[in-house]
Amino acid sequence: MFHPRARTMLLLSLPALIIGVASSLVLIASMKVASVFQQFLWQRLPASIGIAYDSPFWIVGMLTLTGIVVGLIIRYSPGHAGPDPAIEPLISMPVSPSALPGLLLALIIGLAGGVSLGPEHPIMTINIALAAAFGSRLFPRITALDWTILASAGTIGALFGTPVAAALIFSQTLSGSNDIPMWDRLFAPLMAAAAGSLTTSLFFHPHFSLPIAHYTQMRLVDIASGAIVAAIAIAAGMVAVWCLPRLHELLHRLKNPVLILGIGGFILGILGVIGGPLTLFKGLDEMQQMAFSQTLGAGDYFTLAAVKLAALVIAAASGFRGGRIFPAVFIGAALGLMLHAHVEAVPAAITVSCAILGLVLVVTRDGWLSLFMAAVVVPDTNLLPLLCIVMLPAWLLLAGKPLLAANRHEP
């Protein structure tokens, strides 16, 4: 009835569905626990002792304590809470399962404590390791690489609430051939991503889109404006690219994770006092608050973008377990709103989307993911042709440039 190619795809469907659902459940459970813990640390606990949650004392103290606790976990837990996200790429080969409890605990405490990183890197590491560990026993004929692809696709679908991002990302890595078309290779990852996104949607809907005025019609001047905005965002991102490896090397000369992360948490607390509560945490909810605010001006947006960028570099250089995509989206949104406030003739839809495109491109060096994030934050079909055109000079600017990553150090 089915061609052998179709039977092969159907055989992978069940593992893909299981991995997609499981990847989403790991993300949902982690985020729920972190959210409950965050409410306790930043609302109930300070209220019970009569301290404002946004007071300098509480912000500095909480982030310093968060750094110390995460440092203790990294130093003493088996596997040292997994790989350092500042060194490893988002998608990598499976780590030892023994490192996962420490990694999950470090992630939850970091998210709840206000560290300016997202959940994507640790969740990806956890899901890949679990998929490889359990999948190799249940389906021994499937290789570790296939489990890595399925788990990463399911996680991407769960993180962004749609399988589109996974389809775009893997379309450039799972290339087809004369014998096996690209869509044959994409079938199982796309099914895992769809299962992950649908499972996530049953529990909550990620809110990426901002209330920005509709973009009516593309003009030639808008293309030039968008390219300039993207270039400004790339320039800001390249400052982080220059700082991260140097700061990472400087901090890790101390050798002691408790000391390194304690210092990192203290600096994050100082930055939190300067930027305010909006610059804390992973950035998605704070981005919504920033966009809905009626009191922020160009100077405020600049402060938010600069502080969040500095916090991203400090958190990554210190070794906190977290990802950099969500904070980059916040920085891009703040930068775009600032540029629109300075030059109101350029629509906010252009400044925000192109700034996000530039920042995410610096962080991920992935054109499809950058286009996707810009399009979901400013969901306007009239912008898509402009974003595709703006991507071209942005990609040229970054060709051959170093990545936002630290160098490995000898122990």
Curated annotation (Swiss-Prot):
The keyword Transmembrane helix applies. Keywords: Cell membrane, Ion channel, Ion transport, Membrane, Transmembrane, Transmembrane helix, Transport. It is found in: Cell membrane. It is a multi-pass membrane protein. GO terms for molecular function: chloride transmembrane transporter activity; monoatomic ion channel activity. The chain crosses the membrane at residues 9-29, 54-74, 99-119, 149-169, 186-206, 223-243, 258-278, 296-316, 322-342, 343-363, 386-406. The keyword Transmembrane applies. It comes from the Bacteria. NCBIfam families: PRK03655.1 (NF002971). Belongs to the chloride channel (TC 2.A.49) family. HAMAP family: CLC_YfeO. This is Putative ion-transport protein YfeO. It comes from Salmonella schwarzengrund (strain CVM19633). The lineage of its organism: Bacteria, Pseudomonadati, Pseudomonadota, Gammaproteobacteria, Enterobacterales.
